[in-house]
Amino acid sequence: MSIKVAVVDNYDSFVYNLVQYLGELGAEPVVVRNDAVDVAGLRALEASALLVSPGPGRPEHAGVSSAAIAELGGEGLPVLGVCLGHQCIGQVFGARVVRAPEIVHGKASPIHHDGRGVFRDLPEVFEATRYHSLVVDADSIPDCLEVTAWTAGGLVMGLRHRTLPIEGVQFHPESILTGAAGHDLLGNFLELAAATASPRR
């Protein structure tokens, strides 16, 4: 499906793995650094979807990421946040981002999920790679968000906005250790974005 996806690069080495997957799935990714563009510049790209990448640090240090989620996502542009991007989604809508019980760097964990949205048709439980020291606090999720994925220990691994086409995943779908489920998750996001862009198609 040939849809343009604006990719906000939060200075992370995984960004081009995401871009490669998007290209393999037929999308047209356009990568912009988080400090090289503002929301108006992103809007001018006329993309059909926005992907906010992983990266170091906290959401408030992720340049245009949070403003883009709030403004463009708030206008109905489909958004997928990955790792730091997922944390940005949580914080934008009022959740707290806190230290994780343990720092994980390249750890594969079983992910449980609700089988909807970007998780449609994925295995009920799949292994995904995690690189993070922060998590969205499960006790602070606002009414507008729902938890869509979690670890066996109850850590939040996915979020979805209840009325806007915005989803986030804490794990890395583009990691080789995540495997086919990550590729399929990104494919689901592109399908959702295409359906949002062309509701009567």
Model-assigned labels for residue ranges:
Residues 3, 44-121, 186:
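Cysteine-nucleophile active-site neighborhood
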Residues 28-36:
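A short beta-strand-loop structural module common to alpha/beta enzyme folds
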Residues 4, 28, 48, 78-80, ...:
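Structural signature of beta-strand start/N-cap positions in the alpha/beta core
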Residues 171-201:
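Acyltransferase
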